[in-house]
Structure formats: C-alpha cells, structure tokens
Amino acid sequence: MVTRSSRLLCLMLAIIVITGCAGKNSQVESTPSASSNNNGENEITIKFHHWQNTQDEKLDLVIAEFEKLNPGIKVESIRLEAIDSTESLKKLDLLAASGEQLDVVMMPSNITYAQRVGMGMLEPLNPFLEKEGVKFDDEYKLDTSMDGVYYALPGHLMPDMVLLNMDHLNEANLPIPTDWTFDEFFEYARILTKGEGTDKRYGTYIHNWASSNTFALRSQPEQNMLINADETSNATSPALRKSLEILQQTELVDKSAMSYADIVSQKLHYAWPYFNGKASMQILGGYMLTRVGGYDKYPATFKTAFAPFPKISKDDENYAPVSETLYLSVAAASENKEAGYKFIRYYTTEGFSVQGKYLGAWKKLDVDKEIDNIISHTQNPEFVDGQSFKNVMSQVKFAKLGIPPTYYNEIVKAYNEEVELFLLGNQDIDTTIQKTDEKVKKIAQLNKK
C-alpha cells in the first residue's frame, strides 16, 4: 500500500507540474527589515512566510522590536496572497516543493500543522529548547508535540465564546450570562428573536463553517475530534449528537437562527448579521475582541458583551473550544534554523504585547493587562465590554487541542456533507451519525500505513 508520505509527495509534485513556480503568488511586504540589505558580514536575513497583512496585524512592530533586540538578524516578511489562510498554505507547499528559501512558517490550525509535519516540512524544536534550557510545559498553555517532538511553538490562544449585543439584551431585560448551558442559550435566542421576513432579527447566527457543526464536541476536555488518537471513529460520541441538536434546535425548530439554505444562498460574510444588528448573539472566537470595537469592514454601532461558551450540562466544567491559535515553525530546509528559532520564541512570548492584538499561549502573560492593551487599540473602546471578556477568561478551561492524523480534512469533508443533508431536511440525526461513522472508519482504514 502506498504510504501517506508517498501520496503527499506525489500530490505536491503533480501540483508543481500543473501550476508551475509559485513565487509570483507571494509578496514581500514593506517593513523596516524587508527593505534592509545585508550590510554586515555576519548579518542573517530570515524569510517569514505567512498570510497576514503585516501592517494591519502589527507584525511590522513585532519584527522591528525583534531586530532591535537581535541586531545580527533581519526578518523579511512575505505574505502569501490568498482568499484565506488555508488557501495560502497551498502556495507555501508549492514554494517548499520548488526549493524556495523558507525559514519561518505560520500555520492556522492543528490540522494544517499536522499535515506539514507529515510532509517533513518542519524542523524538530526539541534541541533548541534544550539548548535554551527551557521546558515547553513551563512556557506554553498549548501542547504542540507529536510523538514527543515539538515542531512548532503556539501563537494566539483564544477560546470560543458568545458575543452579545448589549442594546438587544437591555431591551429584553436579560443579564449578561456568566455561566450557562446550551438549553439556556436556546432560551435567550428565542427571547431575542423578533419580526418576520426581511425585517426578522434572529436571536443568534451560526455561520456555515465546519467548526460550527461540532460546537459541543469541540468543547469536550478530550476526545473532541471526529477521530480518536488511536484512529478509531468518534462519530458516535454523545457530544457530536448534541452538536447536531444545537443546529436543529436553533435553525429548524425555534428558527431563532438563520437557516443553512439562506446562509448559503446569500453568501453572507460570517460577521454581517451580528454587526448589522440582524442577530443578537453569535458564538465566535476571542479574536473578535479586536473587532467588536469596529474595523474597516464593519464600524461599531453598539456595545458588545461576552459570555462563556455554553455547557452541555449544568454540572460540566467551563471548557471551551480553542477558536484561534497559530503554529509557528522553523522550516526543515532552512539554513538559518537558529535565527528562525530565536524569532518564533520572541514572537510567541514578548511579541504579543508589542503586537497588541491577541492573547497568546505564553504562560507568563498578564492576561488582564493584555486585554486592556488590546481594547485600547480598537477603533472604539467604549463599544467593548472588557470586564465581561475578563470574566470569561478568568473561568475558561481550554479543551485539549489534539493533533489529528494528516488525512483529517477528508473526515471533516465527509461529515460536513452529511450535515448539509441533515440541515436541508434530507435525513435525520441518527442517519447523519451512522453515515458519518461509516465514512470515518472507511477513511481511516484507507489511510493506514
């Protein structure tokens, strides 16, 4: 049987033949470092490939401060132009396969991280950590190891939570929830729903992301993916059934959320209903702290509060899915590995305070201080209820973010196909779970070494 590594290599080579060199798909962004030449004999320039806008994401500030602290190293910021982070990684894969210089690379999820480990793209970091004399578990809240090897340092670490329109809450005399279940979330959504037709205001909005189809599953402390660590199916988990019941209750029964069919047909931006007052609540990631104060696409017109991710049962602990993290790695083919490691260590520790946009996985961050810092940099801090965000962060426990097999995207795609049939009324929950379970088992079997 063909191994996973062989299949990945063949796929990458095939893409290169069809697409050609991907260098034209990347853009060197103007930063103080990128415009500098190597004036000193021992000066090193490392290339940092990512998908973010350097100025908007304040990466330029992080890079400038790093270079000030490390005068012998320059960082060239290279943005991979694409519609989203996942698409940008396809361009990264092309660059790697064509022999382009890669030093530091960024990945947006545990799935994309695991895939690149499987490709052999990433350098083990254990020797660098040992040389520095640090223990990973003492430094970071998120474990990135695969079979005991660390191939990345974690960046952002933000939980999923509920955004609430304070105007709508006050109108309905509803308090900001500080601890609640999904049943209570449903009740809020029913109360906040008003009107009919084009004037209807929904109590909540659930975007058609793959992650929305596994809300309750992803909030479990462990075994929170569609496949278990031993590569057996997890499709029959009660938490996956609850995930489907969440969609059923809001979209099909109470109609307190826009239907899947309407979302798809209107091609809505994920934030449009909430920012335009067409939905009173939305489960989103903590990264929205930087946006609810308004940004170029959606100016703020009301105050947003935050509530914890709902629990399945009242007695459950306050676990929440990890909504936003980054994996920062040194490329295995890099000739500047030591410099690359220094950069990702700085970025994933002190760099977050310089960036002022996200909470990081570094254990030594002063969380409340960082929240205040982030809010102060938003367009309209007065529209952000910082105290409710702090309350969420003070009690949240992060669900374990496991490292899935490299073929996990196949499983997610198969499940989403079944969820679509369910949301369009073509099959019930039992059938959806049964067919998903069969597909997960089949995909796992086909991908066995």
Model segments located where?
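Extracytoplasmic/periplasmic solute-binding protein
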Residues: 147-155, 160, 186-239, 270, ...
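A structural signal for short loop-to-beta-strand junctions that line the ligand-binding cleft
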Residues: 94, 102-103, 132-168, 200-206, ...
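Conserved N-terminal structural module of periplasmic/extracytoplasmic solute-binding proteins
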Residues: 7-15, 21-114, 119, 134, ...
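Hinge/lid segment of periplasmic solute-binding proteins
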Residues: 108-159, 303-307
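Short, solvent-exposed loop/beta-turn-alpha elements that line the ligand-binding surface or hinge
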Residues: 124-136, 178, 196, 202-204, ...
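Extracytoplasmic/periplasmic substrate-recognition and gating elements
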Residues: 68, 74-76, 172, 252-255, ...
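Glycine-centered hinge/linker elements that transmit conformational signals in sensory
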Residues: 189, 230-264, 309
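Long, aromatic- and glycine/proline-rich binding clefts that accommodate carbohydrate-like moieties
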Residues: 358-416, 421, 447
